[in-house]
Structure formats: structure tokens, C-alpha cells
Amino acid sequence: MVSNTKKLELIKSFGKNEKDSGSIEAQIAILTEDIESLKLHFEKNKKDLHSRRGFIAKINHRKKLLAYLRKNKFTSYASLIEKLNIRK
């Protein structure tokens, strides 16, 4: 899980203002940080299948948000991908 201070930091850098947690860019940034922290958890705990279900749900949610952003705001999508280093 992402700590509250880290979430606020991500919202400030990717949101439109410091309280804009609903923008797509901020949501994707928070989900990406959460996914990265869960990757470390699954390296240590390979048999934690119940948490893996939530992990896959987060990945799918981020995937849908990225598809929406790519379809509607491609320039924002491209800059976000580069900043978060998601795709190569």
C-alpha cells in the first residue's frame, strides 16, 4: 500500500492542483506506485493468492484508465508513460 504522504506527493506532481486526486493522471500514478509496492510483496510471498487477486484488479483498472487516456488525450498519455516509465 502507498502511504498517505506518498499519495499526496503523487497528487501534487500529477494532479491539476494539490487536492485533485480524481484526475486520470493522478489515479494512474497512484495505481502505478501501489502496483510497484505489491510486486515486491509477491517476490517474497509467492503463495499469497488472495492478495494477488486484488493486485490483478489494480493492474486491470490502470490498464483501462491508460486506454481511456490514450484514446482521448494522447499527448498527456505519452508524457505520463514517459514520467512513470511504464512502457518501453
UniProtKB/Swiss-Prot annotation:
The keyword Lipid biosynthesis does not apply. It comes from the Bacteria. The keyword rRNA-binding applies. One of its GO terms (molecular function) is structural constituent of ribosome. Keywords: Ribonucleoprotein, Ribosomal protein, RNA-binding, rRNA-binding. PROSITE patterns: RIBOSOMAL_S15 (PS00362). Pfam families: Ribosomal_S15 (PF00312). One of its GO terms (biological process) is translation. Coiled coil: none annotated. GO terms for cellular component: cytosolic small ribosomal subunit. HAMAP family: Ribosomal_uS15_B. One of the primary rRNA binding proteins, it binds directly to 16S rRNA where it helps nucleate assembly of the platform of the 30S subunit by binding and bridging several RNA helices of the 16S rRNA. Forms an intersubunit bridge (bridge B4) with the 23S rRNA of the 50S subunit in the ribosome. Part of the 30S ribosomal subunit. Forms a bridge to the 50S subunit in the 70S ribosome, contacting the 23S rRNA. Belongs to the universal ribosomal protein uS15 family. This is Small ribosomal subunit protein uS15. It comes from Mycoplasma mobile (strain ATCC 43663 / 163K / NCTC 11711). The gene is rpsO.
